[in-house]
Amino acid sequence: MTIYHFVGIKGSGMSALAQILHDKGFQVQGSDVDKYFFTQKALEEKQIPIMTFSADNIQEGLTIIAGNAFPDTHEEIERALELGLPVIRYHKFLGQLIDGYTSIAITGSHGKTSTTGLLSHVVGAIRPTSYLIGDGTGSGTKGAEYFALEACEYQRHFLAYKPTYAIMTNIDWDHPDYFKSVDDVFNAFETLGKQVKKAVFALGDDAELRKLTLDIPIIYFGFGEENEFQAKNVIKETTGTKFDVYHRGEFLGSFEIPAYGDHNVLNALSVIALCDYEGLPVEDVKKELKTFEGVKRRFSITEKANQVLVDDYAHHPSEIRATVNAARQKYPDKKVVAVFQPHTFTRTRTFLQGFADSLNLADEVYLCDIFGSAREKTGNLTIADLAHKTKGNHIIKEEHTEELLKYPEAVILFMGAGDVQKFQAAYEKVLDHEVLTEADLKKSAIN
């Protein structure tokens, strides 16, 4: 039996796919850079070997699954081609894997990971379900009927999939290094829609998605009256959100989610719509929606000292706005401080004013240096260009996160798609030191 070798195994999709193959009984290994990524924890728990990149890792008997961030000139891929080993790109392998399941591809400019996680949780509790989530989580469930997968639009990679269903959460202009306009993004989504076998579930409040023309049913969901599935009577509380759902004007039920913001209501509504279409019991869907704990790096909360620290993947103006609004719903009486690390120079330059406008919805803003990508390590702007447009003109360094101590009782949002987590980790060490120092002072006073 072949051994599957993943080039770039710490990538979020790659990590999840490696776990799926491992669960299905295949022998799996992979390689990547030495740097720690949150995705590797699950790999280590399953004892999947992780090596440092080297041509010497490539031996006879391997099937190479190559991450999309790595060109054919990468040393391991080059060696594999020299040896005549099978080399297949991540998205193409996944496209083949989902055949034979009732597959549900979740795509959209924003909300893919959260919706895939929610769908996997709900459907997986009702019927056996395999899943691949963009937070690095994957499961190759034995006897699975369903396969839920996050489908990324970047470079049109999702066109490798021919799923049974698709959920389209929204269309927005992102990845400006590849997509030239929102029309370009729309064309990619419509092309995917034409490959879907049974039905597309699309946000009907999104003007772009309303333009879809397909030969299969398009089931629209949203807040507007014209949607087939409509969320009404939304009640936002500090413990979560309640809402009623109507299907073609008929009351379907009252639902509750332990999540915040309109975007999470819409994510849940898409799952409710698909489950209804598939005939899954509505009472089971209600029950499972209540127990979803979220996905990694999406409004992940840590309470430390007297502050609330939130880790979030938000890296686009629309996502930052949604994250700030969610924080205000859950913590209405707290100051909101945004710590943001822009991801890629092209995106930062293209959406510079949009980033400023969204960040300025917070009470205070701190900016980290721009995080480049494997494809784009430098650019013709600096973080100062964005800082000049935001409240306070603050730029924060990993070595000096103690500046955030100025905001007792605040919610501090660490946002970004790069390695903004290192800023949170550094700040948590500062807080730990502060707590220890305070304890020492109290002890001295007693003595």
Swiss-Prot record:
Pathway entry: Cell wall biogenesis; peptidoglycan biosynthesis
Keywords annotated in UniProt: ATP-binding, Cell cycle, Cell division, Cell shape, Cell wall biogenesis/degradation, Cytoplasm, Ligase, Nucleotide-binding, Peptidoglycan synthesis
Pfam families noted in UniProt: Mur_ligase, Mur_ligase_C, Mur_ligase_M
Gene Ontology terms: biological process: cell division; cell wall organization; peptidoglycan biosynthetic process; regulation of cell shape
Enzyme class: ligase
RNA-binding recorded as keyword: no
GO molecular function, one term: ATP binding
UniProt catalytic activity: UDP-N-acetyl-alpha-D-muramate + L-alanine + ATP = UDP-N-acetyl-alpha-D-muramoyl-L-alanine + ADP + phosphate + H(+)
Subcellular location: Cytoplasm
Residues given in the record as ATP binding sites: G108, S109, H110, G111, K112, T113, S114
InterPro entries named among the record's database cross-references: Mur-like_cat_sf, Mur_ligase_C, Mur_ligase_C_dom_sf, Mur_ligase_cen, Mur_ligase_N, MurCDEF_pg_biosynth, UDP-N-AcMur_Ala_ligase_MurC
EC number: 6.3.2.8
Domain of life: Bacteria
UniProt KW Ligase keyword: yes
GO cellular component, one term: cytoplasm
Family: Belongs to the MurCDEF family.
NCBIfam families per record: murC
Role summary: Cell wall formation.
This protein's name: UDP-N-acetylmuramate--L-alanine ligase
Gene (name only): murC
